[in-house]
């Protein structure tokens, strides 16, 4: 329990420094290498589909086994064990990184530098950012922070609570696969099919937990718990992903804004249903409000975890 709390605090303070050799970088290199290998040897769609399943097995196994073997190897040395465990837990969390990258877009908008805002946004979203209006930039930034509050914070924390650093790292490997391969366009619809589906499976519970927690903390940014729950449940299916709409709808309801709509991914126009209700016009401040919502959700989730552990410890 203490290791997780320390890892969260470290993430809040230093985040993911650009110079640091982050484990996800090496997971990404492995995925890229496997994709190249698959495309080199398999040209038929059915074999690319099968190879995508092979990538899932390899990446998830390695992501789990490396931290597991290392931690088992140093288990007798408690101080070293906890230092390494905290290190792995820290690397799966992304609150400070989300805050920092999301705020860069906000800062560019405050300076009225729309081109720089589009550029900064392009670093954190998969959609095409060229030509986006100010409102579309804000919407994309808010959606990304809300969605990644699940993928980058609540989900890894949940898996860390259930199975320690190895399971959290395994989740991170699966999530990285999805971000690199899980697109349902012409290029990735076969090799990315299984990476996308396994990510949907692993995010099924975390996304819903994130949505509920966001609703509970919504009054912190001026929202209403019951209204947020109502909108989340109403709009939970307004997304191509079975999971993303939960945190996005909760965040939209908390701020009284509308998300979703038309986006362009890799040159293809993707029509999405809208999420939330436009009670308030999108403004720069909604980026800040979503960041506050993200941190508040993480804190409440940790508090709930500590209460459960203390309760179980007494029984």
UniProtKB/Swiss-Prot annotation:
InterPro entries: Cobalamin_biosynth_CobD/CbiB. This is Cobalamin biosynthesis protein CobD. The gene is cobD. One of its GO terms (molecular function) is threonine-phosphate decarboxylase activity. Converts cobyric acid to cobinamide by the addition of aminopropanol on the F carboxylic group. It comes from the Bacteria. The keyword Transmembrane applies. It is found in: Cell membrane. Signal peptide: none annotated. One of its GO terms (biological process) is cobalamin biosynthetic process. The chain crosses the membrane at residues 1-21, 50-70, 79-99, 151-171, 209-229, 250-270, 291-311. It is a multi-pass membrane protein. Belongs to the CobD/CbiB family. Pathway: Cofactor biosynthesis; adenosylcobalamin biosynthesis. It comes from Clostridium acetobutylicum (strain ATCC 824 / DSM 792 / JCM 1419 / IAM 19013 / LMG 5710 / NBRC 13948 / NRRL B-527 / VKM B-1787 / 2291 / W). Keywords: Cell membrane, Cobalamin biosynthesis, Membrane, Transmembrane, Transmembrane helix. One of its GO terms (cellular component) is plasma membrane.
